[in-house]
């Protein structure tokens, strides 16, 4: 994500706004906050409503104005499992003329995701979470329409179409996503995650999701039995694969764990 932001055409974000929600993954916010001054953009964070645990889609849309050069959408929140209405968000972003990116980390490997329906400009993820991989392997998708306009600052011999070009006067970016490669890649994290990817490729993804829905329904029932308020939306269409509850100080954690185990 850092490489992508730095690779955008000079001036694309300067004097404009980058929009994120308060429930985006903190590392993304830390990164953008640190880049704002150097790249001349204003980082705008859509706030929570009073007492809320996730940002409402309506509030995000209201803050998404024509001055937004880039919006980073959190498909599924890491703290509540709230899932945004992605088609509605993307349609609004197109009307605003913004670049639209989506962080799919909290649902990739469980929920179906198609970069073309609706069409987003970029998507980022990791090999962790539902992907069942190891730390260190990331995912970057970039629309072919955008690739040719991006010039990554961090570049090396693998950034070229022919990585064996040693003529220092003839560097040229690869025409595709390989331009975001740089030096000799560290392959161990990717290799360590390969068994998980192979496993996913051999599974019936609809069956996995159906199994998840059965388990999460049991968790919701258990939370209701304990009188624990849900932080996660109840409708399946509005949540990812996790269930989060608010645990009152007066309720002993061991009691909650024992109930869930039962």
Language-model regions, residue ranges each:
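Pyridoxal 5′-phosphate
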Residues: 1-262
